[in-house]
Amino acid sequence: LDNESRPPPTLDSVAERKTSDERRDDIVRATLRLVATKGFAGVTLRDVATEVGVVHGLIRHYFASRDELVAAAFDFAVTTELSSDRAQLDGLDPLTALAAWLSSTPEDHYRVWIDAWSEAARTPPLAAALDRHHRDCERILTDVITRVTAAGLGISADPAADSRLLTAVADGVAVQHHAMAVIGLAEANAIVFTIAERQLGLTPGSLAQANPAPARGLWAEDAAPAPRAL
């Protein structure tokens, strides 16, 4: 056939020309976009196939189940986010880094975490990814607390224990702020900052005075979740 008589390529044939890594990346990013609008529980393999523009069987070639796929999507987003977070924190002084990490994150970012917590009880692969990245977050905060104490700005007999405590406080406040809307942004930050200052022996008001921008909430490029109602 010459060029004029050759049929145009289909979406599936274009997908077939992509590398394995490119196909997998497309599928994961499409899943994240769907999670942003439908939640983890609302995503099906057929939805993802339609979003990517491929046949259903191609999705199953890379992910044996819906549970495996949504876990991979969450894992990809958080791994990308935390890598960016670490780079940002490393460029800040210790006190500003602490304030940046503890600052309330954008609503669209935390709603995905809250939705993941809700779905994890029914999706073991997602629960495993959630647990792994929760520990990653605790380790990042532990490192920041260690930097604060090493600079002589605060005290901590056990940075890891203080990290677990402050992570629990920040998560609880985030639920009340983002999911329940019973406290506003200023109050949410004030609660977490005040408890952190007391726990670490910091000068009262020092975290707010650091005037930080949130260090978290930068999802993977082209897959940033949009706000949705829970």
Predicted regions and their residues:
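Hydrophobic/aromatic residues within well-ordered alpha-helical segments
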Residues: 23, 66, 73, 77, ...
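Residues in soluble alpha-helical coiled-coils and helical-bundle/repeat scaffolds
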Residues: 64-68, 89, 107, 121, ...
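Solvent-exposed, amphipathic alpha-helical segments
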Residues: 26, 30-37, 84, 112, ...
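Hydrophobic alpha-helical connector segments
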Residues: 72, 82-111, 162-166
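Helix-turn-helix
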Residues: 23-26, 30-68, 72
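Hydrophobic/aromatic-rich alpha-helical bundle segments in the mid-to-C-terminal region
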Residues: 127-131, 135, 148-222, 228-230
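Short, intrinsically disordered or compositionally biased N-terminal tails of bacterial proteins
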Residues: 1-15
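Amphipathic alpha-helical segments used for helix-helix packing
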Residues: 106-131
